[in-house]
């Protein structure tokens, strides 16, 4: 079994959401085998910013969906989407 790297975009529910706090909560999510390799806060438009993560996880059915679901439960998160995924 290999690993996959996912590029994940996390959009806040409002421009006033503290993205550093949201990012810390994301980093505190405990899922076996999931490792955040890189993270950044990127400007989108009109003062809106998003968190972009590079996460590595086992190539197992459903683990990416469960991780996305956990991120979506964080207060201040509007949406979570996978922008890119590749096998390692």
From Swiss-Prot:
Keywords: Elongation factor, Protein biosynthesis. InterPro entries: eEF-1beta-like_sf (IPR036219), EF1B_bsu/dsu_GNE (IPR014038), Transl_elong_EF1B/ribsomal_bS6 (IPR014717), Transl_elong_EF1B_B_arc (IPR004542). GO terms for molecular function: translation elongation factor activity. It comes from the Archaea. SUPFAM superfamilies: eEF-1beta-like (SSF54984). Pfam families: EF1_GNE (PF00736). NCBIfam families: aEF-1_beta, PRK00435.1. HAMAP family: EF1_beta (MF_00043). Belongs to the EF-1-beta/EF-1-delta family. PANTHER family: ELONGATION FACTOR 1-BETA. Promotes the exchange of GDP for GTP in EF-1-alpha/GDP, thus allowing the regeneration of EF-1-alpha/GTP that could then be used to form the ternary complex EF-1-alpha/GTP/AAtRNA. This is Elongation factor 1-beta. The gene is ef1b.
């Amino acid at each position: 079994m290999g690993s996959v790297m996912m590029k994940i975009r996390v959009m806040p529910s409002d421009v006033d959401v503290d993205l550093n706090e949201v990012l810390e909560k994301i980093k505190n999510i405990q899922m076996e085998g999931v490792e955040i390799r890189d993270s950044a806060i990127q400007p989108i438009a009109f003062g809106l910013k998003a968190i972009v993560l590079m996460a590595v996880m086992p190539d197992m059915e459903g683990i990416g969906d469960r991780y996305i679901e956990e991120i979506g439960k964080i207060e201040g998160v509007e949406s979570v989407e996978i922008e890119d995924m590749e096998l390692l």
